[in-house]
């Protein structure tokens, strides 16, 4: 089922949560609503579900205006961050709950309910836990049961609000791979809210990146990462060194040095250059580049992160560089050592005159 939101606006007092949002989600997609806390992503999800009413605008499900349709009539499955399982019910009864609550004329027989519940528990690979209580399950198992319960009523749309946010990093990684595989089997239109950039980029077909109640960019994970539409998008999607400077011909002047720019901006315009840690080369102090000093070297699995501080005109500016953990250069670096930095690539945006993100 397709979903469209048209000119949605929602405010809570003086706080504008959603400011004229229009989006189109084709049927069968798995879409991430990504952004920092307070950007409006959960409010948008709740409006689509019918759990919140928009102040203005429309929600269309398969082309039909559902703005005034009660949440029960929208045929939406909703999965919350904190499971929301009934503690006194077994896993089986939790999954069966929605089916048993249907109006009598629509309610399946107990035999049909049992068949369907066991099929769903088999789908989420937890049929062997059917007689357990939620307290006897791990966090990851509870979330899979919550998803099975949402699917039991055969929703036309599946909405997930930070479904893995309460889980530890290892379990989150396992579950997002599982969710992607499950979606590929079911092909149900699904939207999930997350503030985890890696989660959105790894799982989604498309990413909607939001900030301050507005949409910053929509695209595939590869598009939003490699072709960011704004400084906010670049800075939010992964680690980045951020340097203020002035545009020159095909370059950016920073601290008496020049960095090659990825595109032209008017000469002399204040700009911000963004450089990924793996695109920052560390050179001997007598070479050309940005003056810096090594502050710390950390080895994190197969990568080493070098934390540096700017010198001279860049005093007070922090930088991060990344190298393979077996890079020969690491043996030559010492805390306090003066070095030079050169960017292999830099993404340049016009600087926000207010000092924020452009």
Swiss-Prot record:
Domain ABC transporter, residue spans: 3-237
Q: The organism sits in which domain of life?
A: Bacteria
Q: How does it sit in the membrane?
A: Peripheral membrane protein
User: Disulfide bonds, which pairs?
Assistant: none
Broad class of enzyme this protein falls into: translocase
Q: What does it catalyze? A: sulfate(out) + ATP + H2O = sulfate(in) + ADP + phosphate + H(+); thiosulfate(out) + ATP + H2O = thiosulfate(in) + ADP + phosphate + H(+)
Q: Which residues form a coiled coil?
A: none
Q: Where in the cell is it found?
A: Cell inner membrane
Q: Where does ATP bind?
A: 35-42
GO molecular-function terms, A-Z: ABC-type sulfate transporter activity; ABC-type thiosulfate transporter activity; ATP binding; ATP hydrolysis activity
Its Enzyme Commission number(s) read: 7.3.2.3
Record keywords, A-Z: ATP-binding, Cell inner membrane, Cell membrane, Membrane, Nucleotide-binding, Sulfate transport, Translocase, Transport
GO CC list: ATP-binding cassette (ABC) transporter complex
Explain the purpose of this protein. Part of the ABC transporter complex CysAWTP involved in sulfate/thiosulfate import. Responsible for energy coupling to the transport system.
PANTHER family in the cross-refs: SPERMIDINE/PUTRESCINE IMPORT ATP-BINDING PROTEIN POTA, SPERMIDINE_PUTRESCINE IMPORT ATP-BINDING PROTEIN POTA
| Stated family | Belongs to the ABC transporter superfamily. Sulfate/tungstate importer (TC 3.A.1.6) family.
Assembly? The complex is composed of two ATP-binding proteins (CysA), two transmembrane proteins (CysT and CysW) and a solute-binding protein (CysP).
Which named protein is this? Sulfate/thiosulfate import ATP-binding protein CysA 1
Q: What organism does this protein naturally occur in?
A: Chromobacterium violaceum (strain ATCC 12472 / DSM 30191 / JCM 1249 / CCUG 213 / NBRC 12614 / NCIMB 9131 / NCTC 9757 / MK)
Q: What broad taxonomic lineage does this protein's source fall under?
A: Bacteria, Pseudomonadati, Pseudomonadota, Betaproteobacteria, Neisseriales
List the gene name. cysA1
């Amino acid at each position: 089922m397709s979903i469209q939101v048209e000119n949605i606006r929602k405010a809570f007092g003086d706080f504008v949560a959603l400011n004229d949002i229009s989006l189109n989600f084709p049927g069968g997609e798995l879409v991430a609503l990504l952004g920092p806390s307070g950007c409006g992503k959960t409010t948008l999800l709740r409006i689509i579900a019918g759990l919140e009413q928009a102040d203005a605008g429309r929600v269309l499900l398969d082309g039909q205006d559902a703005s005034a349709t009660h949440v029960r009539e929208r045929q939406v499955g909703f999965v919350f961050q904190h499971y929301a399982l009934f503690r006194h019910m077994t896993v089986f009864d939790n999954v069966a709950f929605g089916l048993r609550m249907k109006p009598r004329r629509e309610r399946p027989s107990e035999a049909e309910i049992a068949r369907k519940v066991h099929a769903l528990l088999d789908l989420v690979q937890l049929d062997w836990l059917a007689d357990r209580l939620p307290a006897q399950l791990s966090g990851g198992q509870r979330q899979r049961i919550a998803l099975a319960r949402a699917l039991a009523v055969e929703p036309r749309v599946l909405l997930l609000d930070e479904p893995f946010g309460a889980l530890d990093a290892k379990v989150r990684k396992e579950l997002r791979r599982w969710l992607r595989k499950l979606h590929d089997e079911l092909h149900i239109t699904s939207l999930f809210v997350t503030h985890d950039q890696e989660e959105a980029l790894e799982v989604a077909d498309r990413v909607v990146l939001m900030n301050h109640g507005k949409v910053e960019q929509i695209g595939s994970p590869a598009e939003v990462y490699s072709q960011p539409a704004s400084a906010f998008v670049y800075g939010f999607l992964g680690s980045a060194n951020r340097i203020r400077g002035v545009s020159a011909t095909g370059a950016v002047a920073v601290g008496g040095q020049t960095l090659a720019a990825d595109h032209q901006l008017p000469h002399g315009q204040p700009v911000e250059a963004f450089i990924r840690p793996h695109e920052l080369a560390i050179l001997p102090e007598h070479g050309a580049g940005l003056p810096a000093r090594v502050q710390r070297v950390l080895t994190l699995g197969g990568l080493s992160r070098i934390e540096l501080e700017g010198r001279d005109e860049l005093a007070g500016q922090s930088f991060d560089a990344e190298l393979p953990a077996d890079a020969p250069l690491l043996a030559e670096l010492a805390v306090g050592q003066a070095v030079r930095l050169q960017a292999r690539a830099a993404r340049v945006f016009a600087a926000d005159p207010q000092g924020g993100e452009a």
